């Protein structure tokens, strides 16, 4: 398996996995704690030796790879809402990459959260609130806001809003890695078959 393509597909699966949790939270007001923790942990791995170090829960990416197949395959499973969120995240990532001040502030704020983890679990409400505020303060202001659709009763709850923003930050983290590994939007069209083949193989590893 082409290592660069494997790593790039892994990062793309990470984006989709975080986005899918946003969608589920917005509709149902709850999330799987293990999946949430796995996505949020990726935010804090800022200096990985290898791309795989970002995704310490390898089994947790299973759903992400399945989403790659659903979104890029000739499938009735393709979700237009997931695609809309993906386009929004990739657009914001481009804005972030061009903002030296944004990148500097992001690194500083993530270091603060890392220190907080000496005392709290990553799924603690206080940690989630801090991750959410990083997204609101730094990422959300870079460009058009991503409009989240869902159940209004769920979306009114502060903890749901905070988890959604924290997960959007996790999606951004994977988008940054995807771009660092050479990922480009045109690959999703012109290299679609290779990405699909890689996702299928990754599901069986």
UniProtKB/Swiss-Prot annotation:
Pfam families, sorted: DUF489
Topology versus the membrane: Peripheral membrane protein
Main location per the UniProt record: cytoplasm
Classification via Gene3D superfamilies: HflD-like (1.10.3890.10)
InterPro entries: HflD, HflD-like_sf
GO cellular component, one term: cytoplasm
SUPFAM superfamilies (UniProt xref): YcfC-like
Keywords: Cell inner membrane, Cell membrane, Cytoplasm, Membrane
UniProt keyword annotation of Membrane present: yes
Database matches in NCBIfam families: PRK00218.1-2, PRK00218.1-4
Similarity field: Belongs to the HflD family.
HAMAP family (alphabetical): HflD_protein (MF_00695)
Name of protein: High frequency lysogenization protein HflD homolog
Organism of this sequence: Shewanella oneidensis (strain ATCC 700550 / JCM 31522 / CIP 106686 / LMG 19005 / NCIMB 14063 / MR-1)
Gene label: hflD
